[in-house]
């Protein structure tokens, strides 16, 4: 179970290990408004604002709150996915290659995570 500050540090550690040249992340948080079965598992946003005549971009990563109690490999898969969007905006071949570079078991973990979420939706909370 990672709390907000631990989630930020966890994400920063992965970013520093694999994406040192990517833009900085300004905010990482759990978001209870993300409905994981109908929509996304996490969200990434780039917010642009004008400050003092300059355009400033801020990157944010939001992870569905359900992952606060998820097995760590499932959380890692979500964080890797959202970090990959810092470099690749679309879900294309380069995006998935980057995900697999950061987490070699990415595809298996994505599959297992979706099975776990389906199990939760059926009211079964044991893995």
Q: Where are the regions that the model predicts?
A:
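Walker B beta-strand of ABC/ABC-like P-loop ATPase nucleotide-binding domains
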Residues: 79
């Amino acid at each position: 179970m990672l709390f907000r500050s631990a989630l930020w540090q966890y994400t920063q550690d992965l970013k520093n290990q694999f994406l040192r040249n990517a833009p900085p992340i300004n905010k990482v948080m759990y978001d209870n408004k993300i409905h994981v079965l109908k929509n996304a598992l996490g969200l990434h946003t780039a917010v642009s604002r004008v400050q003092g005549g300059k355009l400033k971009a801020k990157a944010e990563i939001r992870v569905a709150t359900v992952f606060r109690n998820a097995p760590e490999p499932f959380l890692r898969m979500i964080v890797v996915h959202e970090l990959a969007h810092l470099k690749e905006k679309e879900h294309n071949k380069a995006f998935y290659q980057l995900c697999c570079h950061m987490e070699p078991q990415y595809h298996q973990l994505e599959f297992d995570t979706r099975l776990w979420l389906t199990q939760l939706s059926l009211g079964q909370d044991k893995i």
